[in-house]
Amino acid sequence: MAQLYFYYSAMNAGKSTTLLQSAFNYQERGMEPVILTAAIDDRAGVGKVSSRIGLQADAHIFDENKDVFALIQSLNQDKKRHCVLVDECQFLSKEQVMQLTDVVDELGIPVLCYGLRNDFRGELFTGSQYLLAWADKLVELKTVCHCGRKANHVLRTDENGDAIADGNQVEIGGNNRYESVCRKHYKAALNMGR
């Protein structure tokens, strides 16, 4: 029975690596996955899912206007699709999350979404908010803070490495702009303690 999965974490937990491994597992068995990624994330090139360890795959892109149900339905009519893998799912809209529930419920195709739970301000991304509410399975992928604790927050830093508390929710970047930290060090970096 198909289900909607949300694999979430802070940055550098291996979300894209896990997605690419899942795609490989399906392909190795002669099955056809659909890989989607956010158009806004062009760090490896538009329409590419790439991991820090060098794995990469082509992907269909989505932006805020893409009807992901229609895309997957069309692809499935051309050739049977066995799963949908969504990278950078935090950038999905509420409507797109609901469309993915329709992919599961109406088309019977499992959907595995991978993304950040919260932004650098400690607030949920829209896609993550609705995946937390609507996913059948929630799976936390873990990474570690510099202190060894589980990192569950992301700090955005400026060119001097100082934490930033304000700004646009979305600013594409990697290790040069973001650091995954535990709650204690997140609060300390932003002077949020007592």
From Swiss-Prot:
<keyword id="KW-0418">Kinase</keyword>
<feature type="active site" description="Proton acceptor">
    <location>
        <position position="88"/>
    </location>
</feature>
<comment type="similarity">
    <text>Belongs to the thymidine kinase family.</text>
</comment>
<dbReference type="GO" id="GO:0071897">
    <property type="term" value="P:DNA biosynthetic process"/>
</dbReference>
<dbReference type="GO" id="GO:0008270">
    <property type="term" value="F:zinc ion binding"/>
</dbReference>
<feature type="binding site">
    <location>
        <position position="182"/>
    </location>
    <ligand>
        <name>Zn(2+)</name>
    </ligand>
</feature>
<feature type="binding site">
    <location>
        <position position="147"/>
    </location>
    <ligand>
        <name>Zn(2+)</name>
    </ligand>
</feature>
<feature type="binding site">
    <location>
        <begin position="87"/>
        <end position="90"/>
    </location>
    <ligand>
        <name>ATP</name>
    </ligand>
</feature>
<keyword id="KW-0479">Metal-binding</keyword>
<keyword id="KW-0808">Transferase</keyword>
<dbReference type="InterPro" id="IPR001267">
    <property type="entry name" value="Thymidine_kinase"/>
</dbReference>
<keyword id="KW-0237">DNA synthesis</keyword>
<feature type="binding site">
    <location>
        <begin position="9"/>
        <end position="16"/>
    </location>
    <ligand>
        <name>ATP</name>
    </ligand>
</feature>
<dbReference type="Pfam" id="PF00265">
    <property type="entry name" value="TK"/>
</dbReference>
<feature type="binding site">
    <location>
        <position position="185"/>
    </location>
    <ligand>
        <name>Zn(2+)</name>
    </ligand>
</feature>
<feature type="binding site">
    <location>
        <position position="145"/>
    </location>
    <ligand>
        <name>Zn(2+)</name>
    </ligand>
</feature>
<dbReference type="GO" id="GO:0005524">
    <property type="term" value="F:ATP binding"/>
</dbReference>
<dbReference type="GO" id="GO:0004797">
    <property type="term" value="F:thymidine kinase activity"/>
</dbReference>
<comment type="subunit">
    <text>Homotetramer.</text>
</comment>
<dbReference type="InterPro" id="IPR027417">
    <property type="entry name" value="P-loop_NTPase"/>
</dbReference>
<dbReference type="GO" id="GO:0005829">
    <property type="term" value="C:cytosol"/>
</dbReference>
<dbReference type="GO" id="GO:0046104">
    <property type="term" value="P:thymidine metabolic process"/>
</dbReference>
<keyword id="KW-0067">ATP-binding</keyword>
<keyword id="KW-0547">Nucleotide-binding</keyword>
<keyword id="KW-0963">Cytoplasm</keyword>
<keyword id="KW-0862">Zinc</keyword>
<protein>
    <recommendedName>
        <fullName>Thymidine kinase</fullName>
        <ecNumber>2.7.1.21</ecNumber>
    </recommendedName>
</protein>
